[in-house]
Structures are given as C-alpha cells and as structure tokens.
Amino acid sequence: KAGPKGEWHCQPDNGTFELWFNGRNLFPDTGAYVYAGSAEVMKLRNWFRQTRVHNTLTLDGRNLETTQSVTGLWQPEGREQILVTENPGYKGLKHRRTVFFCRPGLFCNSGRSHRQCQRNREFELSFREGAVNVDAEKNMVTTAYEGPSNVKLQLFPEKARL
C-alpha cells in the first residue's frame, strides 16, 4: 500500500493488502485518517496508522520498527500471476507475503514470518461486514456473504490458532 517512500499516504507498509473480487472489497484496509490537524485529529490519524489495524503481520502487537519493504517478484502475465513482497518490519523478523493468482476466482495469499522465537506473531485481518463462520478445530474461517464472492481462510502451521 505504501512502502518506504510513500508511508505518509497510508501507513508504513508491511505487506498490507486489500482484496476486491466481483466489485466487492473482501478484505478492506482501514486506510489513513487525514494528514494533519488538531490534537484530536492527530489522535485519530495515529490510531489509523497503527500496524495492528491493517491486513498484515504484527509482532507482540507493536507497530513496525522499519519500513524497508521491497517487491521481490512481480509476474503479472502468464498462467499464474505472482506477487512477492518482503519487509524486515521488526528487528530479527522478516515478513514475506506471496500472492498467487492460480485461475479466475482462486488465489493463494501466503504470509510467512522467518524467525525462531517465542514472541507473539499475529496475522491481522479485517473482513468486510457480514456473516463470518469460525471453525477453530480446522483453523478455518469462511464468509457467508450474499452472492458468489466469499472467502475461505485456513491456517496451516501446527501451532497456529484462530
């Protein structure tokens, strides 16, 4: 969404994303509030800029420490379209997001963090308004929106929990 040179336009980027399908925003981003203003306006702006209120990874609930995001691969043509971004958002932790568009209507969004630690890593997601079903045994969330535009999200790591 922003990256190192444009972070003031949104929020410091750590692989933040939105997903639109069939004209519906399935994973809306909170965006940014305004550029400047009174103390009350700045309080709201700072709330919207927090890492934890965007579709991305956080460590111990903290804001990013660095915004050195890079695009590792952008392959928009061919049988599979692929986007890879990477950000060392926290000291000693690298976050890589890979999005594969496999066929019309099917994509895989893989968020990985590279670090051996006991610290709390959370993958923050904002679903659009509507029915969301949680299956804690399968580590799976599905949406039940009207129409064909829905989401199935499943966590695969052994220790991951919804």
Where are the model-predicted features located?
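CBM-like, beta-strand-rich accessory domains located in the C-terminal region of large
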Residues: 38-162
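Histidine-centered metal-chelating micro-motifs
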Residues: 6, 34, 45
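Pocket-edge structural micro-motifs
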Residues: 1-4, 21, 29-30, 61, ...
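Carbohydrate-active enzyme catalytic cores, enriched for enzymes
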Residues: 1-27, 76-77
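Cytochrome P450 core scaffold surrounding the K-helix E-X-X-R motif
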Residues: 27-30, 34-39
